[in-house]
Amino acid sequence: MPPAELPPEERYKKAKEICFDLLAVRARTQEELRQALRRKGFDEETSETLLGKLDRAGLVNDAEFAELWVKSRHTTQGLSRTALMAELRRKGVDDEVAAQAAGEVDRESEEQMARELVRKRLGSLGNVDEQTALRRLLGFLARKGYPQGLAYTVIKEELREYGAESTLLDDAVID
C-alpha cells in the first residue's frame, strides 16, 4: 500500500522503519534519508518531522558523518581533499561542514597518500615505457582528485626512485 494511503501514525511508523533500516547499514546524511523517503513515496511533512526527531535524538548528524566519511575514504580509497568534498556535497552535506571535514586531511598526509598510491600502482604497471607509465599515473591520481602540481611532483620523484632512467617531467613547468 502506498504511504499516502496509510493513516498518519502508520505512515510515520513505516518511514521510521525505513530510516532505521538504512541507518543500521551505515551512517547517513539527512539528505540521503530524505531522498530515500521521497523515493518510497513519503510526503515532505512526514519526512521532515521524522528527520527532525532523528536529528534531535543524535541519530543523524551530518558533521559527524562527514568526519567519519573523510577518514574512511581517505584511508581506504586514497581520495584527496577535493574528491572528498565532492563526495560529501553529493551526499547532501553543507559546503561549510564538508570543507571543515575535508580540512582534517592536511597537505602532508595527502602527499603521503599520493606517494603510496603511486608506489603501489608502479608495481602493477608491468613493462611499459616511461611515457605510458607517466600518463597512466597522472590519470590515476587525477581520478582520485589530486591537484596536478602535486601529482607531477610525486610521480617525478617516485619514478626516479623506482629506477626510471630519465624523467619526462624534468623539463616540465608545474603551475
Swiss-Prot record:
Q: Supply the InterPro entries for this chain.
A: RecX_HTH_1st, RecX_HTH_2nd, RecX_HTH_3rd, Regulatory_RecX, WH-like_DNA-bd_sf
Q: A GO term (biological process) for this protein?
A: regulation of DNA repair
Which Pfam families has this protein been placed in?
RecX_HTH1, RecX_HTH2, RecX_HTH3
The GO cellular component terms are: cytoplasm
Q: Which Gene3D superfamilies match?
A: Winged helix-like DNA-binding domain superfamily/Winged helix DNA-binding domain (1.10.10.10)
Q: Which UniProt keywords apply?
A: Cytoplasm
The cysteines joined by S-S bonds are none
Where is it located? Cytoplasm
- Quote the function comment for this protein: Modulates RecA activity.
| Family indicated by similarity | Belongs to the RecX family.
Q: This protein is called what?
A: Regulatory protein RecX
* Organism of derivation: Amycolatopsis mediterranei (strain U-32)
